[in-house]
Amino acid sequence: PGGFSGGDEPDGSGKFIATTFRNPRIAEQVNNLLKNRDGLMLGICNGFQALIKLGLVPYGEIRELKANDPTLTFNTIGRHISHMAYTRVTSVKSPWFANVNAGDVFAVPVSHGEGRFMADVETVKELAKNGQIATQYVDLAGNPSSDIEFNLNGSVCAIEGITSPDGRVLGKMGHSERKGENLYKNVPFAKDQQIFESGVKYFK
């Protein structure tokens, strides 16, 4: 479920998904998928909101969260944004990025009201050290940016996507699934991150 599940109030529909996944039976099977069956999980936009509310990113398991844990909150402009964003693959630790290289830049559509990644300095340092910062918003030169023209929601350290410690759970705001022939005109950079092809490749 996405869009405006639960009315998108008082926060994004990730809360709706997270509530479902906290059902003990479902939580048990999700943890089993990740810990015992070498599974993958991907959350895009509302899915990322759910993963971070559950603790699946950045911790790799469903857990109770603390007040200072990373979160996604309202965009700095205070409203929904729908735009093309330039994002750089910062780490290829995740199997979801098996078909691209660190440093590759893509143009990816974003559409959300609550996509601003927030975390304290120590948490960001730890994520960077572990290679868990998967993707970042960048300018036309490929550099992470705090400029609202490029970092559209105002995310800390321009972070667009993060992973679990082992990389098998990926959460990101950009809609990597919105790709196809002749969808975008006069937009620089590649559009296809080959995330889904990489996911299939993982199980072959």
Regions found by a protein language model. Give the residues of each.
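A broad, low-specificity signal for short, low-complexity segments enriched in glycine/proline
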Residues: 1-4, 45, 67-71, 119-125, ...
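Amphipathic repeat-derived elements
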Residues: 1-14, 132-140
